[in-house]
Amino acid sequence: MKHRDSIEDLYRQYYQEILNYLFRRTHHLETAKDLAQDTFVKALNGLASFRGHSSIRTWLYTIAHHTFINWYRRDVKYQFTEISKNEGLTQTTYDQPEQYLSRTVKSETLRQELLKLKDQHQSVLILREFQELSYEEIAEILGWSLSKVNTTLHRARLELKKNMTKSREEERI
C-alpha cells in the first residue's frame, strides 16, 4: 500500500510540471499527455530501484526526457505540428485586447524561433528558461557535464537572440 501511495503522491506533485515540459517539447497536448503517462508508468516500474542519487524531480525529468527522445526518434523525424489556440495549458486574463494580441504574437514568434534551433539547444533552453531547473539538474537529466550545460545554454541563447532579431527585422520590411 505504501508503494502505491508514494507513486500517487509523485503523480499529484509532478504531473503538471512534467506535462508542461513535454508539451513544450512536442507542441501537441495529446502527445504530451501520452508521454507524461508513459513517464509515470516507467517511474512506477523503476521506483523500487531508485537509489536517491538525485532528487525525485530530476529523476522524473530524466525519464521524461528519455521518453521524449525515444518518441521523437520513433515517430517524428522533423514533423512539425501547429498548436491550436485552445490547446494552451494555462489561461491568462488581460485588461486590454492589445495586451493579449501583443503577447500572443511574441509567444508565437518565440515558439517558431525555438523550433528552428538544434534539438540540444531546444532541450537546454526549455529546461532552464521554462521549467526553471538548475544547471546541475539539467546536467543530470541530459547526462552532460556542467560545463557543457553552460556552454550549450550560452550558445542557444545567442542563437535564439540572433534569430529573434532577424525575425523582427523581417517583420518591419
Swiss-Prot record:
Keyword vocabulary terms for this entry: DNA-binding, Sigma factor, Transcription, Transcription regulation
Entry's induction text: By hydrogen peroxide.
Any Gene Ontology biological process: DNA-templated transcription initiation
InterPro entries according to UniProt: RNA_pol_sigma-70-like (IPR039425), RNA_pol_sigma-70_dom (IPR014284), RNA_pol_sigma-M_bacilli (IPR014296), RNA_pol_sigma70_r2 (IPR007627), RNA_pol_sigma70_r4_t2 (IPR013249), RNA_pol_sigma_r2 (IPR013325), RNA_pol_sigma_r3/r4-like (IPR013324), WH-like_DNA-bd_sf (IPR036388)
Molecular-function GO terms, alphabetical: DNA binding; sigma factor activity
Main function: Sigma factors are initiation factors that promote the attachment of RNA polymerase to specific initiation sites and are then released. This sigma factor contributes to oxidative stress resistance.
Sequence similarity: Belongs to the sigma-70 factor family. ECF subfamily.
Miscellaneous comment in the UniProt entry for this protein: The interaction between YlaC and YlaD may be regulated by the redox state of YlaD.
Name of the protein: RNA polymerase sigma factor YlaC
Organism: Bacillus subtilis (strain 168)
Gene name per UniProt: ylaC
